[in-house]
């Protein structure tokens, strides 16, 4: 599947959020959009521009392109409940996102690589599809030959307990995680407004 190949730091500055760990230091130094006039840009932002920016935030944060993102939206609409909440829950249940949340990788892109390279199992079976939707009680662990990889061990050691969400139980010693439950929207602390995205697609 195609992935964004451009500069994640430039996109982070344009959207005003750190889309990856390496972008944080750039935002601290230059908290304004890139380009010759980035620092001096002012003026009223249109409703459409605000909606589009929130959609871009969500797409880049979770690392997905337009077609797949729109499919998530359609699925969210078809489910019971609040469409925006449903959309966030679907994105949080992506396999690569759960791997990232568990602390197995420092970024979602790193987590995606672990998944696509076949390092991980779900309930004892190899799953190499980043978009696989994880269900409550499913167990994620590394294949025997992939256990104790330096990058994974380093990521787990650096991941503070406070970063691991309550809906995922992590056994760092055995490099294993259990997806306990689907998170409620209020539990997901990400800098986007999904309701604006719903309004954009509803037009």
Swiss-Prot record:
Disulfide bonds: none annotated. Pfam families: Ribosomal_S4, S4. GO terms for molecular function: rRNA binding; structural constituent of ribosome. Gene3D superfamilies: Ribosomal Protein S4 Delta 41, Chain A, domain 1, RNA-binding S4 domain. Keywords: Ribonucleoprotein, Ribosomal protein, RNA-binding, rRNA-binding. The keyword RNA-binding applies. Signal peptide: none annotated. One of its GO terms (cellular component) is small ribosomal subunit. Residues 93-173 form the S4 RNA-binding domain. Coiled coil: none annotated. GO terms for biological process: ribosomal small subunit biogenesis; translation. It comes from the Bacteria. Belongs to the universal ribosomal protein uS4 family. Part of the 30S ribosomal subunit. Contacts protein S5. The interaction surface between S4 and S5 is involved in control of translational fidelity. One of the primary rRNA binding proteins, it binds directly to 16S rRNA where it nucleates assembly of the body of the 30S subunit. PANTHER family: 30S 40S RIBOSOMAL PROTEIN, SMALL RIBOSOMAL SUBUNIT PROTEIN US4M. NCBIfam families: PRK05327.1, rpsD_bact. This is Small ribosomal subunit protein uS4. It comes from Pelodictyon phaeoclathratiforme (strain DSM 5477 / BU-1).
